[in-house]
Regions:
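An acidic, gly/pro-interrupted, aromatic-rich
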Residues: 1, 6-125, 129, 161-171
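Amphipathic alpha-helical segments that form the core helices of the histone-fold
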Residues: 136-147
Length: 171
């Protein structure tokens, strides 16, 4: 009998650092250089390994996504799934910037063909092709977004993919 890995392990949400790195990688903006100075800037393209945690600033992205407390020795991180995490993905400027960069990259990769651009975004965000039903839903979302505000609808689709369970969890 075939045993699928999803039968053996439950899906888990990405921790703060891998989630931030995945967002930057999806946009093609992750700086993979090793070494060098750390930074306090969440908007830096450096891997999260190089983002310093200020002990006095516990109201940040990492804390929202269950980062370890730097003031204590902990054997494991607490895991939570709470509304502020979804609100962060919906509203934070970093996610918006990543979605815009992804949309721009998709336009360069498949400039005229909407279906190819949808496929490009799915591959970049989810590492797979969309199903025919997902392609139709994405096409409808693009039409609705274009009618609603008249702007470029592609960042909206990119943002939807970045906010979905499939992006923020690991099977």
């Amino acid at each position: 009998s075939d045993v699928c890995s999803s039968d053996l392990f439950s899906a888990r949400r990405l921790e703060a650092e891998p989630l931030r790195d995945a967002l930057l990688a999806a946009s093609g903006g992750l700086d993979l250089r090793s070494g060098g100075p750390a930074t306090h800037e969440l908007g830096s393209p450096r891997r999260s390994l190089y983002i310093q945690t200020a002990r006095w600033d516990r109201a940040n992205f990492a804390t929202l996504f269950d980062a370890a407390n730097p003031d204590a020795s902990v054997e494991g991180r607490a895991v939570s799934t709470v509304a502020p995490q979804a609100l962060f993905l919906m509203n934070h400027a970093i996610v918006s910037e990543v979605a815009c960069r992804m949309a721009g990259e998709a336009a360069r990769g498949a400039p005229k063909d909407g279906t190819a651009r949808i496929r490009w975004l799915f591959r970049r965000a989810l590492s797979r092709d969309p199903t025919p039903a997902e392609t139709e839903i994405a096409s409808q979302l693009l039409r609705d977004a274009a009618e609603a505000d008249g702007g470029d609808p592609w960042p909206s689709l990119a943002r939807v993919l970045l906010m979905g369970n499939e992006f923020v969890t690991v099977d």
